[in-house]
């Protein structure tokens, strides 16, 4: 993955970084019975291939500690326990989420993940009921989990204890 921000300002350096990301996922099935249990797990590794002094900050690698050079690597791992009963599935742990309210996205070298719970139900043909709550996220260019933040509107760089959502989607 290569990112080049040509800033075109005499007072700022360009940010250019090149990296390679590796993502391994394990998704088990469910145990037999009315209530089934399973486990999803992942491991991620991001390697810096290029990003010399003063060129960090493109958003694909972790931000430097002030020297203009991103770390040579970063990694993370996580898991989520899942429980299924009839047409309802509950997941708790580290989640890959994509819905209209919260979406980690895969627009950078490694995807963003969230820590919390999600609940989905597919009892009605064509309809999906979904809800959940998350308290932490792992940004796509970091190793550890952080409290949720937002930079939208007048909120600045505020943190929150959690984000809760619920919704219904239909596919015909």
Whereabouts are the PLM-identified features?
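Beta-barrel outer-membrane channel/assembly domains of diderm bacteria
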Residues: 1-97, 121-123
